[in-house]
């Protein structure tokens, strides 16, 4: 079995490194494509032995399982490009937030009457084999196709099959979840530094606290609230700290964050469906904006800003 990645960014690197570390796939059995062969993740993939190419069609030709690891709005253009190269043997796995199985199948059926499509949502901790992945199978994907993907993704963390209509919510929770955890950890470390701890030690203590708490929860059948209560002594330091969190709306902020991520995921699907702008146009628009902003900034600097004495 060979695996290909359309896109050679952070997700492709995380999965490729996870697969090779787990021993389920040798690096020479993996190929990734990117139009930018100078980006850092391309160099990182090359270092672990992954084959690289700037041509998406070459990745398709050398792959049995093909991961679409690009931004959602680019998916329609990628499918137009590679559709004619998709064969019966290919399992197309979309990792793009919000992009539905139906939208991918609709594109590919113009080239292949029964494309095997699987939609998944994973997260970056797959790089250390502690990821979370859910997947849903498409109209033409067989049971064994789903099992193959589950075997791959299960080698780099927890993996389970769900109904597709749950995947947007999963994106808001575990897909974006590592970013919530890193932000919380950064803030915890800042608190430690404020109270006198060295930065490196503060980060390590915070990370270990979160790791230990997660493991306690996964290894027990207790509700998170019960485990929280077990830490709080009457009149103690922890319950006073939790009062501060509750006063600041800590729970509501997390709930709202999950909701916001989920809603944005659905908006991304709408953008992908509209296909109103191509990747080349997006790149040109960004470059033009940078030039415009630079010119405006230079003008503002010369006309309105006096040099410091």
Curated annotation (Swiss-Prot):
Main subcellular location: mitochondrion
Disulfides per UniProt: none
Family annotation (InterPro entries): 6-PGluconate_DH-like_C_sf, NAD(P)-bd_dom_sf, P5C_Rdtase_cat_N, P5CR-like_CS, P5CR_dimer, Pyrroline-COOH_reductase
Keyword Oxidoreductase: yes
Positions of modified residues (N-acetylserine): 2
GO MF annotations in UniProt: identical protein binding; pyrroline-5-carboxylate reductase activity
Keywords attached to this entry: Acetylation, Amino-acid biosynthesis, Mitochondrion, NADP, Oxidoreductase, Phosphoprotein, Proline biosynthesis, Stress response
Catalysed reactions, as listed in the record: L-proline + NADP(+) = (S)-1-pyrroline-5-carboxylate + NADPH + 2 H(+); L-proline + NAD(+) = (S)-1-pyrroline-5-carboxylate + NADH + 2 H(+)
GO cellular component, one term: mitochondrion
Assembly description: Homodecamer; composed of 5 homodimers. Interacts with LTO1.
Protein's name in the database: Pyrroline-5-carboxylate reductase 1, mitochondrial
Lineage: Eukaryota, Metazoa, Chordata, Craniata, Vertebrata
């Amino acid at each position: 079995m060979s695996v290909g990645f359309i896109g050679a960014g952070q997700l492709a690197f995380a999965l490729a490194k996870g697969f090779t570390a787990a021993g389920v796939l040798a690096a020479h059995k993996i190929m990734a494509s990117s139009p930018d062969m100078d980006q850092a993740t391309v160099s990182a993939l090359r270092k672990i032995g992954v084959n690289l190419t700037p041509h998406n069609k070459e990745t398709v030709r050398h792959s049995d399982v093909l991961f679409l690891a690009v931004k959602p709005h680019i998916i329609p253009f990628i499918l137009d490009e590679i559709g004619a190269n998709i064969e019966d043997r290919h399992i197309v796995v979309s990792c793009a937030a919000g992009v539905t199985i139906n939208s991918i199948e609709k594109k590919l059926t113009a080239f292949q009457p029964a494309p095997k499509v699987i939609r998944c949502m994973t997260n970056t901790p797959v790089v250390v084999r502690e990821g979370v992945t859910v997947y849903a199978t498409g109209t033409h994907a067989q049971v064994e196709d789903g099992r193959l993907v589950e075997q791959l993704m299960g080698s780099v963390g927890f993996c389970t099959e769900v109904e597709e209509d749950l995947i947007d919510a999963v994106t808001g929770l575990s897909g974006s979840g590592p970013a919530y955890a890193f932000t919380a950890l950064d803030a915890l470390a800042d608190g430690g530094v404020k109270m006198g701890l060295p930065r490196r030690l503060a980060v390590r203590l915070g990370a270990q606290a979160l790791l230990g708490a997660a493991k306690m929860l996964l290894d027990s059948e207790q509700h998170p609230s019960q485990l929280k209560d077990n830490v709080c002594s009457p009149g103690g330091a922890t319950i006073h700290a939790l009062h501060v969190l509750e006063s600041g709306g800590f729970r509501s902020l997390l709930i709202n964050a999950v909701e916001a991520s989920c809603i944005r995921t659905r908006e991304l699907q709408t953008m992908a469906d509209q296909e109103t702008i191509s990747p080349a146009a997006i790149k040109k628009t960004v470059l033009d904006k940078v030039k415009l902003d630079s010119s405006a900034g230079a003008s503002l600097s010369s006309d309105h800003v006096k040099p410091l004495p």
